[in-house]
Amino acid sequence: MDQDAFILKEDSEVEREAPGGRESLSDVIGFLDAVLSSEPTDIGGDRSWLHNTINTPQGPGSAHRAKSEGEGEVSTPSTQDNRSGEESRVSGRTSKPEAEAHAGNLDKQNIHRAFGGRTGTNSVSQDLGDGGDSGILENPPNERGYPRSGIEDENREMAAHPDKRGEDQAEGLPEEVRGSTSLPDEGEGGASNNGRSMEPGSSHSARVTGVLVIPSPELEEAVLRRNKRRPTNSGSKPLTPATVPGTRSPPLNRYNSTGSPPGKPPSTQDEHINSGDTPAVRVKDRKPPIGTRSVSDCPANGRSIHPGLETDSTKKGA
């Protein structure tokens, strides 16, 4: 008996739960139809239509359901819960792009702050069109405490007082060449490269370095005398026959313009030719013509110094 009563009780509970499930499904379908049929609105527009009650066809007894045990509990449809869930989803979708945009703006600001100090001079100013201040200081403060060079301080001082340069020139003071280095002093060996060296500029004050002084006429003359080119031996001298000691060249006559006697062939450049620094060069001797005998081979007594074919023939004839 107890088992049969328990089975009947379960069947009655299933029958009571079935109308409620169909009721919630019909509410969802009606809500979707209303959303699809309505016109799209902006994110920030009026969303009061979401709070309106959706009238869906309901059967008798669907709004109020009484239990079989006689309890007076009333169950309302779940349309309000569905509206609240849809509103939360819509608000979540709208808040997500806004949060992403806000995060992107923060990232851009952080990147600009991170790279702003390193690209201070290279960054493009935003107000260049209207001629406003670019934000770059002409004389930035020495924040890190590094010592500045003297040339930089002097350049800044000369830029602040442009009349000082003209006063120095009017007084005849030497004008310092910006960014230049002093020329090395070569000492006494300045003219060692045959006058092509440049004289280093010397200053009147020992504590001033890197100063070029306008030369005076006396200084220019001294430099020219010092760097005067020395005579070189590279030029060639005219070729002149060397004179042999103990001999005298015959006078010129009308038979031979070279100074040789009529019976002697014209003299060639057989002598040693000496120039200033060139070594002695001997020109190759010219052979006499066939059938003639050179003067040096015929001594005064008529005998040949070097016995040849003629001496042998005389001996055979004798």
From Swiss-Prot:
Q: What is the lineage of its organism?
A: Viruses, Riboviria, Orthornavirae, Negarnaviricota, Haploviricotina
On this chain, the residues bearing Phosphoserine are: S68, S125, S192, S249, S257, S260
Q: Has UniProt tagged this entry with the keyword Phosphoprotein?
A: yes
Q: Domain of life of the organism in this record?
A: Viruses
Region: Disordered; residue ranges are 1-23, 38-318
Basic and acidic residues compositional bias, start-end: 7-20, 83-101, 150-168
Q: Where is the composition biased (Polar residues)?
A: 50-59, 191-206
For this entry, the protein name equals Protein W
Q: Please, what other remarks does the record include?
A: The P/V/C gene has two overlapping open reading frames. One encodes the P/V/W proteins and the other the C/Y proteins.
Q: Which UniProt keywords apply?
A: Phosphoprotein
